Amino acid sequence: MNRSATFFFVIFSYLFFGTEVSKAFYSDEAEVFCNDPVEIDSALRKDYRTAFLMVYNNLPDLHGCDIKLKGKKLKTTMAARPTFFSFFRKKGKRKYVIVYNNDPDFKGVKPYDVPENARVGLFAHELMHIRDYQGLNFGGLVKRGWQYLSKRGKKNLEHRIDSMTITAGFGEGLFYWSYFVLFNSGATAEYKMFKRNTYLTPKDILNRMDETGFAVYYQFD
């Protein structure tokens, strides 16, 4: 790959992230810790700060990672990514941003509309993205951007991240998050269809939880 093509992929990776990456793009380091603390935007409501820290405190491999939460206009409720220059840094020096949507005209699910039991699943999902990024070297991060170009690639990634969330013990929160988005939120039909086609559905989540021994019993209509 020539330099111009590599630079293009890096730019794209910063904006868009994609599907599961082959093991060849993972570093030999099984677990890497960052050096700097988490930073939460003071504008984020206290109850949301509490929900985030509850999840974060139960993920010791991410403790000390340089993670910042901030508000911004997005096309989704929340998104996690490395900062641009983190592509060129060692894992222990990377910085990550979790952006929550503060656009009052957003047609999807606004963060402050999310009920308490679903916030845990939302934050856990985003922190699993960071755990995933921490397992990738430069080539893996670049390939994330390339693979994000396809709907199938994005679906594979988000299913992977949802599965990681369940395995980490946050399946119940993820279930409540997914159920709220699809059945109880004020999001548009188009946005709900996007969510249904890209992420695990509530039934999918319950099935995965049952497989991993974290079942929550819920009767669907």
Positions of predicted regions on the chain:
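Catalytic Zn2+-binding segment of zinc metalloproteases
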Residues: 126-142, 167-173
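A metal-dependent hydrolase signature that marks the N-terminal structural subdomain at the beginning
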Residues: 14-87, 218-221
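Long, well-structured alpha-helical subdomains associated
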Residues: 154, 167, 171-221
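Active-site scaffold of zinc-dependent metalloenzymes
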Residues: 79-117, 133
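Sec-dependent N-terminal signal peptides
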Residues: 5-15
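N-terminal secretory signal peptides that target proteins for export/translocation
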Residues: 1-2
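Short alpha-helix carrying the canonical HExxH Zn2+-binding catalytic motif
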Residues: 115-131
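Post-HEXXH active-site segment of zinc metalloproteases
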Residues: 132-159
